[in-house]
Design a protein with these regions (language model features):
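C-terminal transmembrane helix and the adjacent membrane-cytosol boundary/short C-terminal tail
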Residues: 190-194, 198, 273-319
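Transmembrane alpha-helical segments of polytopic membrane transport and secretion proteins
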Residues: 1-27, 305-319
Length: 319
């Protein structure tokens, strides 16, 4: 009896070799792109590094006509606005995610989840325009003025809420950033909370645990790595945001007060505002060094988050 011919020819060794080469090439391209970005940033910013050295990091003055540049104000604005954004966004996102996964009725879960995803899809320039023309005037009248009056007599804390209520400034930029990153963090938290085995939660409810106890003793310990990942995703988004912050932060190189009401600047805003108009080679180099600093900050945040997740996983495995 004649052997039947197979319907298709199985891939040979040659196909495996080609596929392996293509996959390795794709991975190599990623590394080459990363290395190319780092090298190009260092080369482009080298004149500024040579002239100002490490003093560039703590110099407040930024005087383009006289070729005097310092990164302290943009670094301060970037870090403070991102911290404010996380301070607001993390608890709000946590509450949204828990409501969607544990408390929301079935008919509400899907529409609310879609609404959160739509918020994440809104372009940042729309947030910036809304923040400048709608949010800032209301923020000045209904938050900055009354809170400033209440806090003005409190030592130390009062200094953070002193000064005129402009509506725009570091605090306003932080709030806008928080609104922008809430959908990202909430979506990630919701997804990781849904990964908690239903059997574990039902067992906890079966022995008399309340919803609060199930959340704190079952859901959070099981999903803490994913929660940290979501928070770091939001932080990365806040650090790199440009247009919305440019609209609302004030774009001034002043650091004469600790007040969060005062206008300031961020690294991304400085780059967006000045790069097209930079004329001298040193000015361009200083802006490129700002980009290098932002790259380093982002890398440190990512490395810290990875280290934290590894430590948590290691401690969990040791139990």
């Amino acid at each position: 009896m004649a052997a039947t011919k197979p319907a298709f020819n199985p891939p040979g060794k040659k196909g495996d070799i080609i596929f392996s080469v293509l996959v390795k090439l794709a991975a190599l391209i990623v590394l080459l792109m990363l290395g190319g970005i780092i090298v190009s940033l260092i080369i482009s910013s080298w004149p500024s590094i040579q002239k100002f050295g490490l003093a560039f990091l703590w110099t407040k003055e930024w005087d383009a006509p006289n070729d005097i540049y310092g990164a302290l104000v943009p670094i301060y604005g970037t870090l403070v606005t991102s911290f404010i954004a996380l301070l607001i966004a993390v608890p709000v996102s946590f509450g949204i995610a828990l409501f969607l996964t544990e408390l929301a009725p079935g008919w509400l879960k899907r529409p609310l989840g879609i609404a959160i995803e739509l918020l994440a899809a809104i372009p940042s320039i729309v947030y910036g325009m809304w923040g400048l023309f709608i949010f800032a005037p209301l923020f000045a009248v209904y938050f900055q003025e009354p809170v400033g009056n209440i806090m003005s007599n409190i030592p130390i804390v009062g200094a953070l809420f002193s000064g005129p209520a402009f509506g725009i400034g570091i605090l306003a930029a932080g709030v806008i950033l928080a609104i922008m990153i809430i959908p990202y963090i909430a979506a990630v938290m919701r997804d990781v909370f849904e990964q908690t085995p239903v059997m574990m939660k039902e067992s906890a409810y079966g022995i008399g645990c309340t919803t609060c106890e199930v959340i704190w003793r079952i859901v959070l310990p099981f999903t803490k790595n994913g929660v940290i990942g979501g928070i770091m995703l939001g932080l990365g988004r806040a650090l790199g945001e440009t247009m919305a912050v440019t609209f609302i932060i004030g774009n001034t190189y002043q650091l004469d007060s600790a007040s969060l009401y005062m206008p300031g600047n961020s690294i991304t805003s400085a780059l967006a505002n000045e790069f097209a108009e930079a004329e001298s080679g040193l000015h361009v180099a200083a802006l490129m060094e700002l980009g290098l600093i932002l790259f380093v900050i982002t890398f440190i945040v990512l490395a810290a988050s990875k280290f934290m997740i590894m430590r948590l996983a290691k401690n969990e495995g040791a139990r």
